[in-house]
Amino acid sequence: MLDVVKVLSDLISFPSVNDPVRGVKPSYDIVKYIYEFLSSYGIEVNVLESNGYYSVFGSVGSGEPYVMLLAHYDVVPVDASRWSYDPFKPTLVNGRLYGRGALDDKSNVAAMMVSLVELSRLRLNRKVLFAFTGDEEVGGEYGALHILNKLVSEASLPKYLINGDGANHVVICRRRKIFEVVIEVPKEFEVVRGRKGIKTFSAYYPVSQHAHAAYFIPSVDSHPLICASILIKELGAYVTSIEGKFLKSNVIPSTVTVEYVVPEALGDEVRVDLGLTKLIKAVSTLVRTPIPVKAFSEFGISITPNTYVSDAYKHTLVLDVRAMTTKELLYQAFNEVVNELIPEAKIYVRTDVGGFVNTPKNSRLVKVFTEVLNNLGVKYSVGEGAGASDSRFFTPYNVEVVDFGAVGGGMHGDDEYVDVESLKTLPKIYSEVVKKLLS
């Protein structure tokens, strides 16, 4: 079998960063490398483009499409000053290969590339599709979704999807769907008498540091905006302003500062915002909105208020919601709460066309995966992933999906790495799973 460590090292050396804020997209160089690598072994491969993002797409075998391998080569931005090693110079230390994308997700790209070479040498009675995309870190619309639409239009959907976008040998068969609930409240000013106050709250994670909405634990972690909401309710105060480190809808703000006025008959006259006051008071109730679900999740329902902005006329709060539910059920639940607390508010729900992932543990795909891992002596678990992946685009079409990946650490953080022994086993895992599914 080919040297997967060498292939991954080559992939890491391409700085395929996706950073829309700075207008940075992955360069074509890594696409060319993947294309030429696969082509050199006689594999049928094409490059697809959508909105400036490139996907390497092709197949091995013959007959009807049956199994698909999927992974992404784009990576998140990096602060090189915080790394012990050059993030784009693969560095092998104590059995770990360091580099941006070593775990997420170039280890899977490399493993699948090597696996495809082996599979291409066999007489496969059904077709194995593959795709390596360049926009997973920014939503997947121009990569996985673009390819899905192509497959749907050609009536070429596979029965099974193996998405190499997991980690630590977890056979991920469940993932919640992600929504953004947008609440707009008009500004409404009034002068009141009272005592001014100001309070800054910080996010606190006593168990694990993350700042990602997918990993927020409501009964353990402390969200600064929720704390501010409870303070205002308990004081019976009016809000004059809210400021904070509001970055993205899926990132917990590190700090939130609330300026308020506690009513006092002999206090100073202060102009307050009644609309903002209602909105902030509502936060601590909104995050407990009872949402009907369609399937079990070990993470339950996560609701975090992570983005706030205002303009001349209104305040806008965006809640990150993760649940095994539908857009319609979610809207009904939040609309009931908003109508009760802030009847003048407007509410919208944003989401993509993907669904939640809920492949049964007794499905053929999961069973085959676990059989292969057992046969290879690989320690594993079967469970749920907290975040989203491109698998979600395929589930509405009844494609059985699982996510998987090698052992490693530092995903989206500093000193990202993959365990080399785990990496070396990965191509064999993918090859054996595909062969068993085709048998």
Residue ranges: model-predicted function:
Residues 106-188:
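Acidic/histidine-rich catalytic neighborhood of metal-dependent amide-processing enzymes
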Residues 93-104, 378-381, 413-414:
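Short pre-catalytic strand/loop immediately N-terminal to key active-site residues, enriched for Gly-Thr
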Residues 329-347:
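Redox- and metal-dependent alpha/beta enzyme cores, enriched for Fe-S-associated oxidoreductases
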Residues 114-121, 229-234, 432-435:
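Short glycine/serine- and small hydrophobic-enriched flexible loop segments
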Residues 152-328:
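Midchain, well-structured core segments that form catalytic/ion-binding scaffolds
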Residues 249, 308-322, 348-353, 367-437:
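Zn-dependent metallopeptidase/amidohydrolase metal-coordination segment
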Residues 216-243, 281-291, 356-397, 401:
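Active-site-adjacent substrate-binding region
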Residues 1-100, 119-126:
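Acidic/His- and Gly-rich active-site-bordering loop/insert found
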